[in-house]
């Protein structure tokens, strides 16, 4: 920890640097060194004899049943007891005020998962279970940035991240992108030609490297390595936001069908592009993961992985802010993951990949059929849930040229909604929406009924012909 402090203490925000442990957590860490039985009057927790929840049962598919459509469910039950059996979950402890880091059994499962998939290349790393992805990002921001700081972001990025950053008083510095993610040369140009009138050079980069929201781009391995090299050169902390990491897909093929071979864990892992966390050798990546796209959003659970200094500071904040994540949610999640095991969880993730690959392919097939190539430009996403369509502004009808790109895009969006089709307009994904210089629309293929894909894109095309020379 001392080495980490020397290396990264200067990255802590004023708020984070001044954070202390929660007072009751501090008391809990003080243990007696005698053999006298402790009679504790310290805790103000409610008496568990008055907990109206006596038992929790969770039903979910058995490993393999989702592939064979057998609908075979497993049911796991936990009962309230002062004496949990060895190896089982302590439901009483889960329902009481909990450990801020998370239920120990779930923490261990996730740490084992991180070790198996990402294999961090330095020793002093840890995780913190979060109340979902959004608060995970909030933790990272409060850890690192002060009011007035500049933060590096992709030119188009997750709107909730932008909304979370604005009240913190940060300035957005966009990095240009293409279909393979952020451009290292754009990053380097920003850093080398930094305008000191904006304040100190940025020391934080926020990125969604895989299946990026909204562009669907996936940062190539070569670029991932390059960005880590640049991060060391310019002393940058990278916040790696990865809710779509496990939704990686095969190259687009309209005739693609899922592989019916037995699940092979080695093959599954080899197909995953190495994460920034894996490539990081000195602890400058904070990775934010979520169960929302992998299990269900309503559990509001995720986790952060990073060096132990950063995780310790995040935990101090959580102790007096969100406290522990929901005990009930953690019990439900642990019941599923413990039953499946590490390999079963990965097998489930492969099934998710297959499901979303089929949906992506269906939307691309409809796009190839209905979107006019003279105006619409898009690429096949390699991961995630989104198709990002650019409309060629050079083919706008002249009567629209007296308006800004943002105004034209919004006008088209309103017309699309009136005509019964609703993508999302590109400017909502920008730190400064009024600076839009291109027209984009994002189509999500995760939820819409497959039978509506063609009709939706037909409506899109019939609407934009009012604005463009097709």
UniProtKB/Swiss-Prot annotation:
Belongs to the class-I pyridoxal-phosphate-dependent aminotransferase family. Keywords: Aminotransferase, Cytoplasm, Pyridoxal phosphate, Transferase. PANTHER family: AMINOTRANSFERASE (PTHR42790), AROMATIC_AMINOADIPATE AMINOTRANSFERASE 1 (PTHR42790:SF21). The lineage of its organism: Eukaryota, Fungi, Dikarya, Ascomycota, Taphrinomycotina. Its EC number is 2.6.1.57. This is Aromatic amino acid aminotransferase C569.07. One of its GO terms (biological process) is lysine biosynthetic process via aminoadipic acid. Has aromatic amino acid transaminase activity. It holds the Pfam family Aminotran_1_2. Its cofactor is pyridoxal 5'-phosphate. Coiled coil: none annotated. It comes from Schizosaccharomyces pombe (strain 972 / ATCC 24843). It comes from the Eukaryota. It catalyses: an aromatic L-alpha-amino acid + 2-oxoglutarate = an aromatic oxo-acid + L-glutamate. One of its GO terms (cellular component) is cytosol. One of its GO terms (molecular function) is pyridoxal phosphate binding. It is found in: Cytoplasm.
